[in-house]
């Protein structure tokens, strides 16, 4: 049923894509024919658009062209009522209105108006243009401009219509830019003001030098008159304070209102960037690999267990497979920013703390207020006011970052009323992602300032992801895997996935990047990790034979050897080991799993093997000290207590996160974590990417890396009392350590070992607290086995 549903969904999506492409091509064809005025059809469309927009008909044609390209490329109907587009409509309507006002001024001046009706005169001008009775007349703003002018002339007269058009242009600019008119004027006027000030100061310096030259020339001409120049000098001396007066007006620490940087504004500036597809290198088709003969000295190491040559026909998944972001306006949060800033300052003042809010960052999930304390104010004094500040702002909880790294300020993070969703597509579309060589670059989300947060897994080199159930941990892991699939081909990155929960990573079964099918049996997981350890040791043997130190050096060595000798030796791929739930593995085989993870985390970085370990139980018996010491990069989602936060990050803070993707990211080498709103990725998006990857290349699992079924083997019991103890327990049909101690007069340790050996061989059941163990072997069965 699931396959049928997936096929029907694919068929519907394909039909919808064809429909969008046809409509887009039709719009593009109409606009190009009309712009070039090709034949009768082109002239007809010109008349049609001139009727509506007059002399500005080209704007309609360009809009139709953009609409056609959008339908053809994005395969969806664009939203026509966004804030920016509403501003654009205001500007265009104002231009049409101004054009029509100017048209009727000219007609009135010439005396060409026969009727007082604006619409009728415009219609007559259009008919003259259609009939060709005169050279194509000026139609102003067309019929739209005529209707606007008729309404505005009735309400405001001609001059008032022009004023209203200018006001509408200003409103449109505010809507398009998303900034207040005051901010825009400040941005434009500040460089002009600086230029004028510099020129004025330069003019004052020139005047001073000119006056000093004049004084020196007068002294040389009249040396006998000494008093008069002295008087003049006294009159000229009071001028330098003008310079000081200029500097007194500058007070950078005094702000009437805090500077606000909005997350939504940053998103609109980055809206619909042009993403160029990476050009694949053009090369000849692969030839059959012939066994190398002769004394070739490329690699005389152990044989390659798994590597594959590049599939030239493989195409990377496009970003169009991911859903576009749906941003909320966060209008309520924007309105409350100034009020909250004043509340913070009043609260500080009431507790005798001199501090001022100077900058505010409106992020996706939280708003960060930058507070600059006065000289002599202790940081701890502000940190201790955490509960009082939360009470003043009526916030669920606040987090204080004291101080902000690189700034002499304290950050107060307040949850937003509306949480803006961050999509993986917008994170991967950022400029930071424009690095095709970084195969392990992963997208995490956006920080409070709205900047995309990406990280290179090979520089981490291992990652721990922990958080409570439902906090966004699985979505984060899916986002990391999808980021790698969007950037790397199967011969460049391989993956080993371990999923004891059996439902999170099963969707990736069949992708060509997998070394083995997703491991869902916890007993096989330790064996899979041991196979990765063996691969790491094999790689180090390769490095020692070739005289290289890491995977980058080895691959460069292979490239040089292939270029010089014409060989086809494949390069080593990176390996990413993903463990979705560490707690289950630690319950089944803690010692084996911990040993393998410890060895990999200590040594695997240079071999190109990287670990991503996720767990929803961040306790010390799961995230042991040995594991944590070797995994320096951590991501903490919302947890229930400060103890769990300290287990993950070695510091508090994660207990104050909001959930739903709100995380603290602590990269290697950083002193403090960065708060990030995680990128959301739906199940449908994951399925689309996986389907695309599978259609490009089928999975070829490596037999050496598939964990096998292991039969349990029991060593012989060396204790001579074992047979007698089994006979006693089967006869009594009850088993306990104390009974063996009494009957055989032995110590507790020896008796407990006998019971453990019986449990391994299925003679007795498991430990059940104060109750005696259940005897699983009947007396009749024992007699049969012994006879």
UniProtKB/Swiss-Prot annotation:
Changing residue 467 to S: In SpoIIIE-73-11; defects in DNA translocation. Can complete engulfment and membrane fusion. It is a multi-pass membrane protein. Disruption phenotype: Cells lacking this gene show a chromosome translocation defect and aberrant compartmentalization of both sigma-F and sigma-E, and fail to complete membrane fusion at the end of engulfment. Its main location: membrane. Residues 218-233 have a biased composition (Basic residues). One of its GO terms (molecular function) is ATP binding. The chain crosses the membrane at residues 22-42, 51-71, 87-107, 154-174. GO terms for biological process: cell division; chromosome segregation; sporulation resulting in formation of a cellular spore. It comes from the Bacteria. The keyword Transmembrane applies. ATP binds at residues 470-475. Residues 450-646 form the FtsK domain. One of its GO terms (cellular component) is plasma membrane. Residues 175-787 are cytoplasmic. Coiled coil: none annotated. Keywords: ATP-binding, Cell cycle, Cell division, Cell membrane, Chromosome partition, DNA-binding, Membrane, Nucleotide-binding, Sporulation, Transmembrane, Transmembrane helix. Gene3D superfamilies: 3.30.980.40, P-loop containing nucleotide triphosphate hydrolases (3.40.50.300), Winged helix-like DNA-binding domain superfamily/Winged helix DNA-binding domain (1.10.10.10). Changing residue 473 to A: Abolishes ATP-binding and DNA translocation. Homohexamer. Forms a ring that surrounds DNA. Assembles into complexes that could contain two hexamers. Belongs to the FtsK/SpoIIIE/SftA family. Consists of an N-terminal domain, followed by a linker domain, and a C-terminal domain, which forms the translocation motor involved in chromosome segregation. The C-terminal domain can be further subdivided into alpha, beta and gamma subdomains. Specific interactions between the gamma subdomain and specific SpoIIIE recognition sequences (SRS) regulate the compartment-specific activation of a mother-cell SpoIIIE complex. Interactions with nonpermissive SRS in the forespore lead to inactivation of the complex. This is DNA translocase SpoIIIE. The lineage of its organism: Bacteria, Bacillati, Bacillota, Bacilli, Bacillales. The gene is spoIIIE.
């Amino acid at each position: 049923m699931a396959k049928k549903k997936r096929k029907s969904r694919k068929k519907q999506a394909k039909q919808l894509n064809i429909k969008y492409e046809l409509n887009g091509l039709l719009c593009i064809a109409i606009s190009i024919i009309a712009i070039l005025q090709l034949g009768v059809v082109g002239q007809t469309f010109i008349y049609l658009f001139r009727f509506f927009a007059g002399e500005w008909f080209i704007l309609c044609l360009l809009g139709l062209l953009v609409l056609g390209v959008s339908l053809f490329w994005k395969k969806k109907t664009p939203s026509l009522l966004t804030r920016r587009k509403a501003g654009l409509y205001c500007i265009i309507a104002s231009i049409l209105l101004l054009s029509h006002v100017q048209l009727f001024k000219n007609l009135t001046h010439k005396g060409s108006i026969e009727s007082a009706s604006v619409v009728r005169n415009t219609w007559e001008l259009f008919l003259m243009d259609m009939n060709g009775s005169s050279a194509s007349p000026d139609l102003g703003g067309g019929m739209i401009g005529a209707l606007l002018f008729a309404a505005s002339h009735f309400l405001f007269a001609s001059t008032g219509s022009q004023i209203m058009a200018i006001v509408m242009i200003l409103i449109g600019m505010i809507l398009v830019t998303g900034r207040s008119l005051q901010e825009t004027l400040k941005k434009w006027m500040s460089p002009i003001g600086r230029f004028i000030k510099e020129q004025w100061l330069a003019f004052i310096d020139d005047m001073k030098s000119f006056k000093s030259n004049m004084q020196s020339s007068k002294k040389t001409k009249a040396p006998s008159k000494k008093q008069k120049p002295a008087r003049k000098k006294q009159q000229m001396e009071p001028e330098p304070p003008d310079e000081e007066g200029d500097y007194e007006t500058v007070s950078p620490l005094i702000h009437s209102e805090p500077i606000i940087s909005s997350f939504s504004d940053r998103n609109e500036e980055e809206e619909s960037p042009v993403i160029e597809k990476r050009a694949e290198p053009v090369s000849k088709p692969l030839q059959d690999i012939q066994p190398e003969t002769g004394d070739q000295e490329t690699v005389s190491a152990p044989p390659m267990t798994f590597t594959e040559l590049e599939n030239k026909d493989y195409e990377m998944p496009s970003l169009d497979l991911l859903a576009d972001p749906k941003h909320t306006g966060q209008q309520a949060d924007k309105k409350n920013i100034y009020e909250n800033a004043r509340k913070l300052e009043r609260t500080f003042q009431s507790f005798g703390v001199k501090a001022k809010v100077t900058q505010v960052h409106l992020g996706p999930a939280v708003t960060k207020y930058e507070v600059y304390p006065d000289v002599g104010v202790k940081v701890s004094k502000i940190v201790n006011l955490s509960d009082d500040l939360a009470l003043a702002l009526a916030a669920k909880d606040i987090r204080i970052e004291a101080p902000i790294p690189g700034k002499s300020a304290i950050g107060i993070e307040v949850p937003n009323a509306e949480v803006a969703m961050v999509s993986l597509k917008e994170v991967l579309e950022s400029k930071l992602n424009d690095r095709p060589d970084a195969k392990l670059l992963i997208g995490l989300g956006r920080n409070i300032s709205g900047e995309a947060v990406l990280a290179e897994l090979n520089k981490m080199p291992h990652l721990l992801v922990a958080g409570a159930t439902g906090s966004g941990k699985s979505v984060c892991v899916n986002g990391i895997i999808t980021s790698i699939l969007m950037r790397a081909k199967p011969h460049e990155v391989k993956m080993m996935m371990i999923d004891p929960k059996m439902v999170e990573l099963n969707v990736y079964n069949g992708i060509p990047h997998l070394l083995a099918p997703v491991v869902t049996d916890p007993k096989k997981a330790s064996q899979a990790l041991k196979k990765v350890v063996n691969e790491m040791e094999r790689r180090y043997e390769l490095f020692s034979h070739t005289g290289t130190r890491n995977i980058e050096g080895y691959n460069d060595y292979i490239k040089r050897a292939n270029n010089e000798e014409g060989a086809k030796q494949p390069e080593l791929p990176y390996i990413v080991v993903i463990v979705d739930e560490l707690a289950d593995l630690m319950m089944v085989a803690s010692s084996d799993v911990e040993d393998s993870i410890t060895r990999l985390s200590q040594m695997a970085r240079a071999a190109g093997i990287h670990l991503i370990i996720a767990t929803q139980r961040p306790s010390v018996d799961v995230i042991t000290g040995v594991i944590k010491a070797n995994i320096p990069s951590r991501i903490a989602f919302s947890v229930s207590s400060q103890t769990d936060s300290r287990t993950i990050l070695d510091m508090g803070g994660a207990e104050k996160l909001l959930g739903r993707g709100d995380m603290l990211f602590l990269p290697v080498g950083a002193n403090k974590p960065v708060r990030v709103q995680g990128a959301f990725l739906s199940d449908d998006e994951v399925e689309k990417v996986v389907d695309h990857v599978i259609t490009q290349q089928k999975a070829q699992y490596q037999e050496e890396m598939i964990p096998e079924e292991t039969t349990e083997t029991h060593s012989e019991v060396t204790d001579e009392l074992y047979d007698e103890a089994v006979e006693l327990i089967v006869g009594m049909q009850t088993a306990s350590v104390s009974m063996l101690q009494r009957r055989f007069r032995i110590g507790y340790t020896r008796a407990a070992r006998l019971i453990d050996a019986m449990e391994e061989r299925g003679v007795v059941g498991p430990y059940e607290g104060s109750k005696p163990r259940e005897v699983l072997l009947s007396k009749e069965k024992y007699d049969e086995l012994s006879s």
